[in-house]
Structure formats: structure tokens, C-alpha cells
């Protein structure tokens, strides 16, 4: 042990043991933590810490591959004949507020349709809430 309380290897074998333990710890980390660590290490070499913190805060809630892209939303909405912005029937049957460009969701939307368009159909794959940053199952 050093004066500061942290162990420092002083032989090549010690360095090898330290490196192997770091590799094992990295393999045990979950996918989100690996992703955050990679982002931090890449950004710290190019930007100041406060900018890295802002970038990390904005990128941590979205994981690629869960079908939350705009293209996936449009594809699912078109599949069930709804507008991807306001969840109303599109093309409108009669006088509707939906023009598929500037429309907004109404006061009472069909939550099942909104969940399907936003997150997909499966209920067993967990997704990350942008507000909590935690995994939980999609509601019906």
C-alpha cells in the first residue's frame, strides 16, 4: 500500500494482475454502463469536463436498436393507419384536426395506440424511461 491508501503494483506481474482484474470488471458491467464509460473516455480527450457532462446527460437515455427512431414510429403508424404525431386516424375520414404536419395529440388519446406507435408491440423487452433512467416493462 502507498501512503495515500491505494495499492500500486511495483512489478510486471502486479501490473498484469491489475489489468486482468480491470478486464473482468469491464465484462461484468451492464451494457448501459459500458456505453457511458466509453462515451466519457472518448469525450474527455477532446472536450472540457463540463461539456462532456452535458453531452453525456443528453445521450444516456437513448439506446440504439429499440425502435424509437422517427422512421420506426412512422412505419408503425402507417401500418395501423394512424398519424404518428397526434395518433388520430390518418388520412382523415371527415373534418379532422390532423394534417400530419402541424397536429398535436388531443386531450384524450388512445394510450394503446400511442404506446404501440412510440415503443413497438412487444411487452417483454424492457425500455428506458427518459425521465427515470431505469428499465421497466412497457405498460399495456
UniProtKB/Swiss-Prot annotation:
InterPro entries: Carla-bd
Recorded superkingdom: Viruses
Region (Basic): 73-76
Entry keyword set: DNA-binding, Host-virus interaction, Inhibition of host innate immune response by virus, Metal-binding, Suppressor of RNA silencing, Viral immunoevasion, Zinc, Zinc-finger
A biological process from GO: regulation of DNA-templated transcription
Keyword DNA-binding: yes
GO MF, any single term: zinc ion binding
Zinc finger (C4-type) boundaries: 83-98, 83-103
Family designation: Belongs to the carlaviruses nucleic acid-binding protein family.
Function: Suppressor of viral-induced RNA silencing. The potential mechanism of action is based on sequestering siRNAs.
Name the record gives this protein: RNA silencing suppressor
Natural source organism: Lily symptomless virus (LSV)
Amino acid at each position: 500500500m502507498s501512503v495515500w491508501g491505494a495499492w500500486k503494483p511495483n512489478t510486471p506481474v502486479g501490473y498484469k494482475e491489475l489489468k486482468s482484474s480491470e478486464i473482468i470488471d469491464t465484462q461484468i458491467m451492464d451494457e448501459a454502463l459500458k456505453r457511458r464509460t466509453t462515451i466519457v473516455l472518448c469525450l474527455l480527450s477532446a472536450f472540457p469536463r463540463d461539456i462532456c457532462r452535458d453531452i453525456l446527460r443528453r445521450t444516456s437515455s437513448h439506446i440504439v436498436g429499440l425502435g424509437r427512431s422517427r422512421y420506426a414510429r412512422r412505419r408503425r403508424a402507417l401500418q395501423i393507419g394512424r398519424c404518428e404525431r397526434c395518433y388520430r386516424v390518418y388520412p382523415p375520414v371527415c373534418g379532422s384536426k390532423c394534417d400530419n404536419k402541424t397536429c398535436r395529440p388531443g386531450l384524450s388519446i388512445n394510450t394503446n395506440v400511442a404506446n404501440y406507435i412510440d415503443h413497438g408491440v412487444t411487452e417483454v423487452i424492457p425500455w428506458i424511461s427518459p425521465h427515470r433512467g431505469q428499465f421497466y416493462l412497457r405498460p399495456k
